Amino acid sequence: MATLHAYFDPANYSLFFVLGVLTHVFIFRRGEWDLHVFNILQAFAVLESSLVYIVTRAVQAQGLSLWKVTTISSCFTLSTLMGLLISILMYRSWFHRLRRFPGPFCARLSNLYITFRAFKKNRLYEEVQQLHRRYGDIVRIGPNELSIIDPHALRALHSNSSPCTKGPWYSVEHPIKALQMTRDKEEHAYRRKAWDLAFSSKALREYEARVAGYTTQLVDQIEASQSTPIDASLWFNFYSFDVMGDLAFGRTFDMLKNGTAHPFMELVHSNMLTAGSLSHLPWIFPLLKRIPLLNQKTLEFQGWLKQQVDWRQKNNPDLPDVFSWILSDYDALDKPTAQDTINLRGDAQLIAVAGSDTTAASLSCLFSELAVNPETCLNLQRELDQYHAEHDKPDHLSLSKLRYLQACIDESMRLYPAIPSGLQRMTPPEGLDIGNTYLPGDTIVTIPTYTFNRDERLFTHADKFIPERWTTKKELTKDPSNFVPFSIGQYSCVGKQLGLMETRFVASQILVKYNVRLAHEDVARDFVAGLRDGFTLAMPSLSLVFTQRTT
């Protein structure tokens, strides 16, 4: 029978400490464990319970209390955890394959560092920009993550020929796997076929009348409140969510008509801000989904989404919408699995969210810049006046040929990218060369779009709104191919043309009828200061005044 003294022998604690080190070296040092965090916690709980049982049986003749037994076993468990933690920290600090890349020392140790910076003001894109100014083109912002603004990186990471895959962040919604979150290249290519049909030129022509109808509703609201300040970003959100609600679920949210936010929009904005702030801690999402109270909004949202999809499956719209193509692909399956059904709901969510948040952001930032730059706005209005003089009714094909309108849209998207912190990728196991720099395999890499788009090496006067850089002053853009607001390659934005259609319709219909100005001189400053990084760019209030044009 073991004595009590034996259990406090330092050799026993050393044994468990070494066990923790070996657990890191041979298990956790390899692969992705983010989705298994709950199982890992369960494993340590089982370890603790087993140790309590073993120690109890071993010293039962000595009549120790449960408290003392638990204390002994907990010390063993803590020794294991200490070994694990110290091994992780030492490895990340001095032995990790990314040790030669510059960056804050704390970023080497844990993703908590970059998460803290993200939470400070919800403006991670500015935090990363500051890091690049200090450390250069390639910055280690996490234990296994690099942020890169080297121009060579764009095609190396995102082109069709890139060997990179999507990073761990794309698993945060597990088990939901919308098209955007699909990491397997073959599966993504297969599922994307239905989406390509949904956004083909033929399909877009069928959506055009509905987009025009919602644009008219938006203009009517501006007409009703002209010459008085309105929150333009709020109304642009109403517009984009109404459009995508129609195209995703076969029925609108009626926010333009009612002038009030639908709970769906509020849930989306709340969830996106949380997701953006915690994007570098993918392991925390499985925990949040399982913890009562903390998962309440998620459960409400998923319940509401299920109701919408169930209703849409039973009610075919008179006119085809985006979801018609996705649903047709689902119905073609011989025996849809439970995962197929979950993915269908994820795709419905993707249609409604991806096309609404980004379009609202594009419109808000565009009109903010036009209000600040009246000469630019006047030049655009001249182009639109000529267009409307030659066309009885606007259509997307002809609107897409307006050079200055597109230049203003492009310049706005350059300064205020819809996904300011960029898209996560994972290098292939064999690694990847970026220019003259070798990136080790299985490394998380991101091009921070906001910082990249404001790089003076790529764009002269990079922080200024100059639409002419895309038309008459092309020398201000060193290489136009570095501007990819909808990304490139097989993962590029499938809804690009629909988003542009909405933006072009709204800008052309409003500016041909109204002048736009800031409600007061601090609006532009407050707007830029209020932008937030919620994976997509989240909009603050934008108080604008629209007045009827007299000429």
Curated annotation (Swiss-Prot):
Residues annotated as transmembrane: 8-28, 35-55, 69-89
Induction text: Expressed during infection of barley and Brachypodium.
Positions with a binding annotation for heme: C493
UniProt record similarity statement: Belongs to the cytochrome P450 family.
Described function: Cytochrome P450 monooxygenase; part of the gene cluster that mediates the biosynthesis of cytokinins such as fusatin, fusatinic acids or 8-oxofusatin, known for their growth promoting and anti-senescence activities toward host plants. FCK1 is a bifunctional enzyme that performs the first steps in the biosynthesis of Fusarium cytokinins. It first condenses adenosine monophosphate (AMP) with dimethylallyl diphosphate (DMAPP) to yield isoprenyl adenosine monophosphate. It then catalyzes the removal of the phosphoribose to produce isopentenylaldehyde.
Protein name as annotated: Cytochrome P450 monooxygenase FCK2
UniProt keywords, alphabetically: Glycoprotein, Heme, Iron, Membrane, Metal-binding, Monooxygenase, Oxidoreductase, Transmembrane, Transmembrane helix
Species this chain originates from: Fusarium pseudograminearum (strain CS3096)
Glycosylation sites: N258
Major enzyme class: oxidoreductase
Gene that encodes it: FCK2
